[in-house]
């Protein structure tokens, strides 16, 4: 065996597909899409490992504009060539080329599925688990419909409003949530327009939003947002009107506004807010939510539904990090 390591070439993706199986997970599929020619504008470097000129493995390291403290890293080796040290050598070489990153960042992160060969490899190379993420499907009717609006004495408790995904108010709420749940992987300073394009635009697939407000509109304007739900659904060319079916699960970003509630009960109140919106969403249709363990109030709601048997985990991934420099 004479393994050579070289930069990526144009047809390497097609040649690797001959020796790689189908992508075993969504993270692997996403990482494969990042394999490619060197990019200096958005720093990215890909290396391939070849045996007698035939690619058998590849790896990539690249910057994340939103999370600049670490570089993403990924290595994949053909199944019949694993445990030969190829992956380890690729990663070592990627660490060296990472030193060329304009940011001078050399700390790494990667995402794997629990129990996978990728997880074992990453841990063996010194990466440690930092965050678990789950996609959870919640069944239609999983929660009773909540009471909204005015109480018997005429006072307002909470209200729900449809809000345009281009709303600055909504964008700020989503951004506050996103930043708060990524303390473990700090976010860069991103302009509000870029946040909207990335998370709430037509390009992002967002097509509707609900917000929960803490009361009724007052003379000073609308009550503050306490929770939000943004729906996404991939476009289906066979259904250009994008009609939902009874058992189709919408992809939903469900979150809360940090600090919208005060005092010791803030986490509990945030949980109640997202549970209220979730109850409205699943009245007729199931939904799928991505839940990171850092989303503590939402985790509590989802774990209760899992325990009750009205929700199940669709996928689970773990982000591992290596902060060595």
Stretch-by-stretch model annotation:
Residues 88, 96, 100-106, 110-133, ...:
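Conserved active-site alpha-helix within GNAT-family acetyltransferase domains
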Residues 137-166, 299-301, 305-325:
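C-terminal "cap" of GNAT-fold acetyltransferases
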Residues 73-75, 108-112, 289-291:
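Conserved hydrophobic beta-strand within the GNAT/NAT acetyltransferase core sheet
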Residues 23, 27-35, 40-42, 65, ...:
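Short, flexible helix-coil linker/hinge segments at the edges of structured domains or between repeats
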Residues 181-214, 221-325:
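Hydrophobic multi-pass inner-membrane translocation pores used for secretion
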């Amino acid at each position: 065996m004479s393994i050579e390591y070289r930069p990526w070439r144009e047809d390497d993706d097609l040649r690797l597909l001959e020796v790689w199986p189908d992508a075993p997970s969504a993270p692997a599929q996403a990482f494969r899409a990042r394999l490619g020619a060197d990019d200096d504008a958005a720093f990215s470097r890909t290396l391939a490992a070849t045996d007698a000129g035939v690619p058998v493995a590849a790896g990539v390291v690249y910057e994340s504009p939103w999370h600049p403290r670490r570089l993403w890293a990924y290595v994949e080796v053909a199944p019949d060539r694993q445990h030969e040290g190829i992956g380890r050598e690729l990663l070592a070489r990627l660490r060296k080329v990472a030193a060329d990153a304009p940011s001078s960042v050399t700390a790494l992160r990667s995402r794997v599925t629990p129990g996978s060969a990728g997880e074992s490899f990453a841990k063996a190379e010194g990466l440690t688990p930092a965050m678990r993420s789950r996609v959870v499907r919640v069944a239609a009717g999983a929660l009773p419909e909540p009471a909204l609006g005015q109480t018997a004495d005429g006072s307002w408790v909470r209200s729900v409003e449809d809000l345009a995904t281009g709303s600055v108010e909504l964008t700020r709420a989503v951004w506050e949530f996103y930043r708060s749940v990524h303390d473990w992987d700090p976010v860069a300073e991103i302009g509000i327009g870029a946040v909207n394009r990335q998370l709430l635009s037509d390009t992002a697939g967002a097509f509707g939003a609900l917000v929960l407000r803490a009361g009724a509109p007052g003379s000073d304007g609308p009550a503050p947002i306490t929770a939000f739900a943004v729906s996404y659904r991939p476009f289906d060319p066979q259904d250009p009107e994008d009609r939902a079916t009874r058992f189709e699960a919408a992809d939903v970003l469900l979150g809360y506004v940090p600090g919208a509630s005060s005092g010791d009960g803030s986490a509990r109140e945030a949980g109640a807010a997202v549970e209220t919106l979730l109850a409205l969403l699943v009245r007729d249709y199931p939904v799928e939510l991505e839940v990171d363990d850092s989303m503590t109030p939402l985790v509590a709601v989802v774990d209760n539904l899992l325990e009750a048997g009205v929700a199940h985990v669709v996928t689970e991934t773990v982000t591992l990090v290596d902060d060595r420099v």
